[in-house]
Amino acid sequence: MLQGDWSSDVCSSDLENTDGSNYNFSINCGTEGKTSRKYVKELRRKHLYMALSMVFFAQGVPLLLAGDEALNSQQGNNNAYCQDNKTGWVNWKRNTGMEALQEFVQKLAAFRKAHPVIRKAEPMHLNDYQHKGCPDLSYHSDNAWTAGLPEEKGAFGVMYCGDYVVNDAGEPDDMVYIGYNFHTGVNELALPKLAGKKKWYVVMDTAEQEHAFLPEEKLAENQHRITVRPQSVVLLLGK
């Protein structure tokens, strides 16, 4: 489950709580279960959008549990395979939060499809083995080409070099930069300098409550640094 109100599993399968994984990393964002508190709901949304972004921007095949795109929490039960009731069922009744989430997932999938550099079949080398001017995959912090942010900062940038693959048009893919900030404070990340006349464009910012994916790509005001708001993800294209 990716919904942000997990809690410990319950003994409801007659297996004395020995079924499933012993690892249950969870957070309720300050309130257990359903809530009308806007702050808690917004924090859960942020966590959910961060998790989904990591899934779709990773190189491997994205895997979703049924209902992840519909705010399905299984009422905090992470082991509901034996629950033929409301706990294990997916509620497809539409609501505002669900519609916004489904739109976000659709756009994540569409972006991934449009940019083959994210889903390369070959393993990443993390070096410039084809002499393209930068590694196929690189990590960045408050300094470009350096992944050494202190752990307490909770932020880092990832760049996929589009020159290593061609898109459906037979042309090199764009540069793809993802800035992750898991911290409760604002973080600034460095943007690598692009070759030639290429510029960085902001495509997505999950800190935006209405539309995480911008209606139109926006030229980054600062071509050297990007501000990532608390517990959010930004996506940029270099082209």
Predicted regions and their residues:
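Short glycine-rich loop/turn motifs that provide flexible caps or phosphate-binding loops at active sites
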Residues: 3, 19, 29, 65-66
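Short, compositionally biased low-complexity segments
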Residues: 15-28, 74-86
